[in-house]
């Protein structure tokens, strides 16, 4: 038996062959793969967020369709598959297609050349890409006697990266030209599988392949990517225990922290099983640390392209309503901010009814990453200017150093409510509330804005591992810090938190009515 200390976690590995041959841990999805190929539809599209295991899934499909029985020994599929046919497979990884027409054509040209060499095809020098694609599919079928499987990974990558540039329409034209052949060559094809993040319906994959099944919301595929609670218990208990020991936490506490930070995705209204982000979970178990892996994965880079003024709209994204057709059928370019945020993994399904879906943040990691991304635009400062002040604020709030924390916050918000013209439609106190809550969310604290209790509405509660801050904001011309602390005490805002083991601190903050920033503060005691 392998010593649990030396079990190999597949951090960053996307090759199913490498995972199996080099003895990395593998969460067995092979039964779902078999069901999809043998019992599902012929043409399939699956949308999942970035870093959610789509490429490993495509690689698993390729190995299965090529009949690599040796790689599946001991997995669930061995009880299902009897024939192990070796289908010809054509695989395209569109994440290598760049962000302009020339790079896209160059990638397809090189990939088609590989398959032309494999099947001894000599293309006409003047042949269009679509003609070459057809020749590859038809020849592969004729030479092997088996219909062809076509796997297209990250189909939307060139379209995402060219969005809102002159190259986007050119890239769309390439897609229409090349991939329309998939419908025309139906007689030669066994199985088509396409993955992506965002859905552009106006290209040939969706407008021409009108028989393409969007399996993204189907209950039987809700867990085809990602890791479930049950799969953690089956596969990762030794790593969970090691992480507990390394941090002096109980196993239950470690589990609860991982769940709060990386779990919470739901992909089907008819199968609301919780799904962890596999990239973040495996990285956390490997490093034995709970940190934000999402932000470093490149998942936030496209946000400004698809959402205008996101920094002003964050509070509206929690528990937002979306019509079912919008979420399941609409084009990302016209479906609104909520659609992009769902497809890219910032939001997930929280509930559904006959009126549509309720969306919200899946977990703390994603919520923090989103707030971090928009903070520079809101604070009108560069990321480098903000980082050191954020680090100080996080440390001081975590250790109960009130004066030092308030001075860091003061430096972060100086002049912002006055200078940021995007805030002009808000009243001044609302501007401060937005800015301060965004800053606190961006450093990963648990923040509730305008929390209702029996005696009133608290402006803000902020929770760290050792402290709970009950905060009231007041403009100077509305009584300032004195009125704020009196309100905390008179309305007993701290009482609901007294049973918590953490120390409760009431804090009145005085703000300049002209938007020049934080003036003073006072503890409520």
Tell what function each PLM region has.
Residues 178-185, 339-347, 437-442, 487-507:
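Metal-dependent nuclease catalytic cores in nucleic-acid-processing enzymes
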Residues 430, 434-438, 468, 486:
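Feature representing long, continuous alpha-helical segments
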Residues 1-428, 443:
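Phosphate-binding site recognition
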Residues 169-175, 475-494:
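Mg2+/Mn2+-dependent nuclease catalytic core
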Residues 149, 467-471, 505:
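Structural motif
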Residues 496, 502-525:
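Domain-level recognition of nuclease-like catalytic cores that cleave nucleotide substrates
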Residues 436, 460-462, 466-477, 491:
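Conserved catalytic cores of phosphodiester-cleaving nucleases, focusing on short active-site segments
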Residues 140-144, 439-465:
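Active-site metal-binding core of divalent-cation-utilizing nuclease and nuclease-like domains
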């Amino acid at each position: 038996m392998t010593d649990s200390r030396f079990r190999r976690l597949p951090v960053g590995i996307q090759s199913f062959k490498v995972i199996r041959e080099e003895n990395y841990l593998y969460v067995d999805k092979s039964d779902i793969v078999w069901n999809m190929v043998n019992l599902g539809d012929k043409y399939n599209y699956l949308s999942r967020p970035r870093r959610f295991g789509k490429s490993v899934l495509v690689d698993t499909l390729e190995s299965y369709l090529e009949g690599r029985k040796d790689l599946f020994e001991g997995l669930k599929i061995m009880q299902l598959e009897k024939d192990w046919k070796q289908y010809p497979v054509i695989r395209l990884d569109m994440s290598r297609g760049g962000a302009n027409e020339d790079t896209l054509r160059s990638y397809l040209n090189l990939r088609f050349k590989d398959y032309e060499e494999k099947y001894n095809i000599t293309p006409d020098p003047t042949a269009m890409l679509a003609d070459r694609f057809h020749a590859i599919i038809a020849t592969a079928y004729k030479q092997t006697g088996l219909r062809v499987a076509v796997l297209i990974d990250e189909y939307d990558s060139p379209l995402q990266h060219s969005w809102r540039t002159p190259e986007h329409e050119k890239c769309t034209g390439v897609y229409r030209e090349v991939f329309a052949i998939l419908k025309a060559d139906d007689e030669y094809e066994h199985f088509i599988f396409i993955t992506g993040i965002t859905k552009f319906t106006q290209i040939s994959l969706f407008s021409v392949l009108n028989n393409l099944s969007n399996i993204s919301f189907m209950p039987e595929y809700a867990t085809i990517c990602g890791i479930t609670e049950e799969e953690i218990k089956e596969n990762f208990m030794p790593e969970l225990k090691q992480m507990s020991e390394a941090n002096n936490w109980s196993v239950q506490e470690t589990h609860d922290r991982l769940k709060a930070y990386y779990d919470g995705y739901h992909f089907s209204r008819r199968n609301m099983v919780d799904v962890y982000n596999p990239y973040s979970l495996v990285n956390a178990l490997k490093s034995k640390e709970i940190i934000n892996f999402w932000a470093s994965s490149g998942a936030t880079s496209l946000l400004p392209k698809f959402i205008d003024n996101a920094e002003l709209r964050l509070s509206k994204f929690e528990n937002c309503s979306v019509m079912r057709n919008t979420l399941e059928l609409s084009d990302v370019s016209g479906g609104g901010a909520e659609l992009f945020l769902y497809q890219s993994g910032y939001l997930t399904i929280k509930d559904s009814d006959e009126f549509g879906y309720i969306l919200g943040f899946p977990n703390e990691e994603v919520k923090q990453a989103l707030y971090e991304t928009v903070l520079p635009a809101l604070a009108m400062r560069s990321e480098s200017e903000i980082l050191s002040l954020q680090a100080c604020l996080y440390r001081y709030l975590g250790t109960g150093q009130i004066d030092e924390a308030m001075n860091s916050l003061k430096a972060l918000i100086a002049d912002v409510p006055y200078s940021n013209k995007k805030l002009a439609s808000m009243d001044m106190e609302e501007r401060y509330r937005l800015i301060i809550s965004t800053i606190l969310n961006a450093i990963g604290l648990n923040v509730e804005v305008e929390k209702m209790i029996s005696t009133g509405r608290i402006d803000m509660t902020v929770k760290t591992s050792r402290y709970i801050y009950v905060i009231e904001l007041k403009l100077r011309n509305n009584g300032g810090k004195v009125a704020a602390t009196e309100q905390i005490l008179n309305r007993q805002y701290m009482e609901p938190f007294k049973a918590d083991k953490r120390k409760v601190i009431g804090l009145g903050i005085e703000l300049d009515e002209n938007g020049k920033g934080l003036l003073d503060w006072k503890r409520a005691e």
